């Protein structure tokens, strides 16, 4: 190696390269790690040095050299690369490795306009000094490389134009805690700040992207997902697209319910004009969604919902595929098809489904969600009424078209609207659930707006976070984590701004939360359980019972302190009905685990004191945030032991947690013989979860005789999901062979899904 190379320092001066210095930094970064070779990293990086190289480029070269060595056999390179990257990050942010005092840092950032000046109004210098004693900057060293790159790319406060970074991770965590608990009484709030900081900085609670990147800055919109319902008038359609633009510009993903829009050829103003149908308006929504990237963090994304019995359904199901022409395709949104028991019954009996325009059949659209018996009565009545425009189609043909499009695009989602309303925290007669969100885990009431400032409409917001099951050693720990997650997210509802009155009204009235889980695959591996063989069923029952019980208990305690949410009377909880009362009883055949908690005492306490939050749980995908915690994604099985995530900051390799000890215990996605075991687990989770679950179906064509997945199998899995009370189905993944060779040259590549995911956490 040429010792005479000149390097250019950060201040512009030059000096001879100091290889000893590089060696010392590598030595420091490798301390306590297994099976990492410093000389390997040095060799790989030295060949890339050149005369006049900047010290920052030297640093980046070394980091990259270490990251390239991450593999199944040497997973600890992900920590070596991470420590080097943290060193580099802190140099960039602070000009030195040691972070400054918290108070000095906050003063400087507020002066620069990077942090919210409320921080200095809410807390004294003394309190900041106390918070400084809570911080453990060494926790930075527990990040994996993928986590540091995600922090750098998405979460740390920065100038996205120049690439300057202004903070490191522990300041992010303590200041999120400080902002969220700023309105708590002076005497208790620092204790909450410390407890919450400890839970998030040790990865026990995972926070969603909008909270991580936004809380502490002057932008105060942190809902991950927004649900907007559209009426069947031009005013409502325009109000919907205005609301979409407002929220997409503020980092949110969108769920649109466009199911009320009348069909092509319907009369307008008593026949004065001829309706252009749904597609032009869907295009209008697509343009609104794509008009802004999500606050510089993600591209806009939306899922649009419509009922299976809509007169135009055959044209709507194909909107995403690659055939057709620009005029009859709207490819840059995803779609959710809404189904209920009557549709499935027609399929099973080999009968027809009759398609209508919602505008021609009074009361039918509302009954589809609010009252299943009334829906069936009206539906059969309208089928017999010859004066109503309609079209009959064989149920099997319609379901097959839907499943074919789901298989080919992967992005046609399913919402079982009857399950969403019969096993719901809301009374469907007063507050029916008529749609879901971008990633299908949210199920909340909405009402169409007539204009963007309409006070009577309701936009639903989902405020998310998750428990990291991999970091939990006993279910008792969930009690404290539930208290912290519920209190922090509930405080967030008051802390954030609402760009649209209809959103503020719903958020303040219902105070809905969606707390989920990450690292479920690691949790199963640790307990020696598998997805596919039923061995995890009872453990899953016990775990999700504990999660929902402790969340309800925390919200009930908060209601005693701060009052129940104003619209508590619209929930089924107000009538003393709990998830354990309304679940699909078919689940009893696959999980015989008894209930372990005192639900009856909780029921009485909820009837007496109410709940602070109308909903508490939802199981969301978590591609990005689980990388921060070095966890597996949500409830999903991993595709490979090493995953490669393509993010805008390059290729990130991540090894599943504790691979060295547990590699035989993990069940990989494509090792599962089918979807049955997974769908059973989702059904068991849904017994307790009050909103919904982003559940995927997965198919490996090579497992079938002709190398093609038979339609019969797709329909069977759809019916299995319905049977076990599954409310929603998200992606359909088909194995294509390229992504899963498990040598380290071709690890599984995963994109960040849903346009880099928004109601993912």
Language-model region placement:
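Core nucleic-acid recognition elements
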Residues: 1-3, 13, 36-174, 178, ...
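Alpha-helix capping and helix-loop boundary segments enriched in small/acidic/polar residues
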Residues: 13-17, 164-167, 187-191, 211-217, ...
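A glycine-rich phosphate-binding loop feature that marks nucleotide/adenosyl-phosphate handling sites
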Residues: 44, 63-65, 79-87, 199, ...
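Terminal amphipathic helices with adjacent charged low-complexity linkers/tails
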Residues: 77-113, 149, 339-341, 420-451, ...
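Catalytic alpha/beta core of large soluble enzyme barrels
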Residues: 124-150, 440-446, 489-494, 591-596, ...
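Function-dense linear segments that define catalytic or interfacial modules
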Residues: 157, 164, 171-189, 193, ...
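Internal maturation/activation junctions in enzymes
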Residues: 199, 482-504, 508, 530-622, ...
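Polar, glycine-rich mid-to-C-terminal structural blocks
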Residues: 318, 327, 331-409, 417
